[in-house]
Amino acid sequence: MFYGFDIGGTKIALGVFDSTRRLQWEKRVPTPHTSYSAFLDAVCELVAEADLRFGVKGAVGIGIPGMPETEDGTLYAANVPAASGKPLRADLSARLERDVRLDNDANCFALSEAWDDEFTQYPLVMGLILGTGVGGGLVLNGKPITGQSYITGEFGHMRLPVDALTLMGFDFPLRRCGCGQMGCIENYLSGRGFAWLYQHYYHQSLQAPEIIALWEQGDKQAHAHVERYLDLLAVCLGNILTIVDPCLLVIGGGLSNFTAITTQLSERLPRHLLPVARVPRIERARHGDAGGMRGAAFLHLTD
């Protein structure tokens, strides 16, 4: 059995998957913030419960936001302060007496989708998350590409390209990102960025779901906004796809529920790609909230 943990600032979610990659059991508990030992106990207790339930010693994989293992072997995860700065992988491996694998949660999302029965035919899969932020991951031949700093797929921290400024106007404000840089595309293409763009052009403060509801009702202002957003997304993706050249692009995060993104993006991309480039197949993520657990469990399928 394969145990996949999706760990975030508020919850620890465990999913148990069988050899056919089907979910057999899941459980969620709050993420402890009081101490590192309490955090370790929470993970180990879930593993012990799963071992007892299934009568096996399951393989453990963990997806967590941040850098799973820095040069000195410690975790960097600002959203999980009880474990950040600690040698999480080594400590869990010792306590659980088994190999524990860690990766960035966005890489786990991409891995989950790449191992979907419908998508395993594609050798190079790009996962793109359009949610609270913008991120993603790359999977080549069923294995995540992590890089030495675990930042492969941090697409949200690419800067706005020149074509974006041509589209939006050269007086378009370059916003300072939480990473400290100016003009990161996350500030415009995330769910919050989607809402910020609307406020910038129309001086109305609405959340993304409210704007999308107006679009569905045929509101002309919302329609113009969505057209502008999709054009900006295509411009930014043009740079990324030219570098990555994936066979499949899977889009997740809250904005992936907006069907216009997956249905209208393909037609906008060719003018931002090389003439010989092929537009990848574009699909909405299949596994929703279970994607993080799936991808973490499947870290043991990448040998």
From Swiss-Prot:
GO terms for molecular function: ATP binding; N-acetylglucosamine kinase activity; zinc ion binding. It catalyses: N-acetyl-D-glucosamine + ATP = N-acetyl-D-glucosamine 6-phosphate + ADP + H(+). ATP binds at residues 4-11, 133-140. Coiled coil: none annotated. Pfam families: ROK. Keywords: ATP-binding, Carbohydrate metabolism, Kinase, Metal-binding, Nucleotide-binding, Transferase, Zinc. Zn(2+) binds at residues 157, 177, 179, 184. This is N-acetyl-D-glucosamine kinase. It comes from Salmonella arizonae (strain ATCC BAA-731 / CDC346-86 / RSK2980). The gene is nagK.
